């Protein structure tokens, strides 16, 4: 990572801010359920440690930032809708990656609701990095003008883990939007699907320099297939489903999304084009046997997305 903040952006005016946590897959979605008050306390603790620092900013330790487990380097331009969601770290004096996202419209990004600290968050605390396979490339950052968190969101494990970020006008030419999957289109385990991101490459090992976007092919599974192992692991005996109807499961032996991939895309090749079918949400560890990653099922939220955004490309 470079030793200076990403160019083209100044730190937001209002302080303090929540810390650049890396919400992602965890043994249960407890991390995603942290209250805004607790996030604020965590941020104050981190900020106070660096409040006396002066001079040139130092690199953000990669363990604090964020990869795909079992993946490999993504070719430039293959996933042109992939973006990185950033918040400003006053401790490290740079914009730090917290989550992934997908460009679904030239001015709209779809991500996970748990990547947003609280529903009425000031959009100026976020930036979007787009159009580059390298997490800390030299491209400038895009400003966020509006945030819409799904009104039913409480925590990732309860569903509705989806949010929209509207971007200020920009002139990036090397990005492309991804199509949403039609509501009527059914997914099968035979569909060719890929997950991408800059998160951890194994559970306790972050993506190393030069922080190249990772990709991994995964298989979409029926919800009932992953419901039982999650139920067994949690000791849940009630009637409520753990893998809800607005979620889907995907994974393959040794390949999975992980910490720092949250909010990023799960795309499948459907009807001759790539379609966004899932948003990285939660899971039990990373690549643990019988525990595929859990994603927000984008098809369920297409009507809501269109209601907010209007016509898509």
UniProtKB/Swiss-Prot annotation:
Entry's Gene Ontology BP terms: proteolysis
Main location per the UniProt record: secreted
Enzyme class: hydrolase
Any single GO CC term annotated in Swiss-Prot or TrEMBL for this entry: extracellular space
Disulfide bond residue pairs: 99-115, 193-268, 226-249, 258-286
Start and end residues of each stretch annotated as Disordered: 1-27
Ribosomal protein keyword on record: no
Domain Peptidase S1 stretches: 68-310
EC id: 3.4.21.-
Active site: 114 (charge relay system), 161 (charge relay system), 262 (charge relay system)
Compositional bias segments (type: Pro residues): 1-22
Glycosylation sites: 143
Keyword terms: Disulfide bond, Glycoprotein, Hydrolase, Protease, Secreted, Serine protease, Signal
UniProt-listed PANTHER family: CHYMOTRYPSIN-LIKE PROTEASE CTRL-1-RELATED, TRANSMEMBRANE PROTEASE SERINE
Record family assignment: Belongs to the peptidase S1 family.
Protein's UniProt name: Putative serine protease 29
Species name: Homo sapiens
């Amino acid at each position: 990572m470079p030793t200076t903040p990403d160019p083209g952006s100044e730190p937001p005016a209002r302080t303090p801010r929540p810390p650049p946590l890396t919400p992602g897959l965890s043994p249960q979605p407890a991390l995603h359920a942290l209250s805004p008050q607790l996030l604020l306390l965590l941020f104050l603790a981190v900020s106070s440690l660096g409040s006396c620092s002066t001079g040139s900013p130092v690199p953000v330790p990669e363990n604090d930032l964020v990869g795909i487990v079992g993946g490999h380097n993504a070719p430039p331009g293959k996933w042109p809708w992939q973006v990185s969601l950033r918040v400003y770290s006053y401790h490290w004096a740079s914009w730090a990656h917290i989550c992934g996202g997908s460009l679904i419209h030239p001015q709209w990004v779809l991500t996970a609701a748990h990547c947003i600290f609280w529903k009425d968050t000031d959009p100026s605390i976020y930036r979007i990095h787009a159009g580059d396979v390298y997490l800390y490339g030299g491209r400038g950052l895009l400003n966020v003008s509006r945030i819409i968190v799904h009104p039913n969101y409480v925590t990732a494990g309860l569903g509705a883990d989806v949010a929209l970020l509207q971007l200020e006008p920009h002139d990036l030419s090397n990005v492309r939007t991804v199509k949403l999957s039609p509501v009527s289109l059914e997914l099968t385990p035979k569909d060719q699907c890929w997950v991408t991101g800059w998160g951890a490459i194994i559970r306790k090992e972050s993506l190393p320099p030069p922080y190249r976007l990772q990709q991994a092919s995964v298989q979409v599974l029926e919800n009932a297939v992953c419901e039982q192992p999650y139920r067994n692991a949690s000791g849940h005996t009630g009637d409520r489903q753990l893998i809800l109807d607005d979620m889907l499961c995907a994974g393959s032996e040794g390949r999975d999304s992980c910490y720092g991939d949250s909010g990023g895309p799960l795309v499948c090749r459907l009807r001759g084009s790539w379609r966004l079918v899932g948003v990285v949400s939660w899971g039990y560890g990373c690549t643990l046997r019988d525990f595929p990653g859990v994603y927000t099922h984008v098809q369920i939220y297409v009507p809501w997305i269109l209601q907010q955004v209007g016509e898509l490309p």
